[in-house]
Amino acid sequence: LQKSVSLDKNTTAAQLHQKMILESIILLNNTLSKTKDGLVEKITQNDKNDLKKAPKIKKELLKIDFDKDIYSVHNLIRGLSPFLENKQLLSGVEICPSAWFYLNNKRIKVQKTLITKIKNPNSRIDTDNKNYLHINFRDKALSLEMIQPEGKKPMDIKSFLQGNSIDVTDIIS
């Protein structure tokens, strides 16, 4: 048996992981029941030679390249994110190592972002130093929602900004 799982434009790897665990329990029970009753239909699998292995996740893949388009960056972050919901992170699973970048030579892991409108188009970084921190792209901004500064615990952006002052001229790489 098979089952599709729906995703939205902000679903993270950890959220998909949890969703698949729940769906697989139901699917396994249905499969066992149908197998017992002789009602399972065979599904032809792809030829083994046609399958492509996923690449090993290397450190270079995790580094955010802000020269890419906003959707590629947002999707990289989502695809590597341990963020579940309400500041909760999936732990003990190597599939969610977090994408990262440098802010003034300090590594920042990014767990959650949203794509939003640009508020200040005159700089790469935009912040009010209280509520939001945006990285501006060509026509949209990437809102950093949940991050983990080097040597610190994960935190929402408001908590980060309480103890850190960001200037629009700060360097991201």
Spans of features found by a protein language model:
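Internal anion-binding site segments
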Residues: 48-173
